Amino acid sequence: MYTWDAEQYKQSSSNQKKWGTELVSKLGLKGNEHVLDIGCGDGILTAEMAKILTGGLVVGTDSSEEMINLAKKNFHEKDYPNLSFIVKDARKLDFDGEFDIVFSNACLHWIIDHAPVLQGIKRSLKGGGKMLAQMGGKGNAAEIVRITEQLIKSERWARYFNDFTFPYGFYGPEEYKAWLTDLGFKIVRAELIPKDMVFENRQKLAYWIETTWMPYTQAVPEHSHEELIGEMLPELL
């Protein structure tokens, strides 16, 4: 389990928020649905859905206690009575037919084995419910993956990565179609959608590396984080 700096993530996740807002618009919410948001992070998108769901509710879950604490701080229940946040691992969902929609943005690629996640989503949905999820897919961030994998084999860093395995679950449509079909889902769309990431400045790119690539940065001593990130930055600018 990784330790998230929730405030830093908030500063470096504008791309994820943009894509998530686009995804929410595709839900076609009527306002009375019960929605589960898996990997809600700082809760911004979850709160946006709560504003629409005047006759419904939304539950945001995240495995990071730091993220959930920030979400609760920013979106208090007295202002959002139909919104709640829970610390919960996406692989251990224990809801039973409670939701019309399960939504997830920029989360599930943090998990290698998606089978327990998809099984939990299936159990969480009411009959006729739907799932809409967006995540890093096959070939995602190929250039930074190449740079990082090369870097950790260098003499300077290799000692920290002796037992390191690639930490992300980047899967393609064919794998997902097979998994969803086995669970009885009717597939409307399962596809790879190219996205470009743009950062306002060097510092926000550094923040993004620190958070999004934390399996690498947290593998080295804390005092070496800036050095590792500093070696990655020139290749990405």
Regions found by a protein language model. Name each.
Residues 115-130:
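A short glycine-rich, Lys/Arg-flanked "PGG" loop and its adjoining helix->strand segment in the class I
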Residues 91-101:
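A short acidic, Gly/Pro-enriched loop at the edge of an enzyme's catalytic core
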Residues 101-114:
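A short SAM/SAH-binding and catalytic strip from SAM-dependent methyltransferases
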Residues 34-38, 42-92:
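Class I SAM-dependent methyltransferase SAM/SAH-binding core
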Residues 1-33, 44-48, 70:
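Conserved class I S-adenosyl-L-methionine
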Residues 24, 47-50, 72, 118-122, ...:
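A structural alpha-helix within SAM-dependent methyltransferase catalytic domains
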Residues 130-199:
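Conserved catalytic/acceptor-binding region of the Class I
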Residues 189-237:
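C-terminal helical/coil "lid" or tail adjacent to the Rossmann-like core of SAM-dependent
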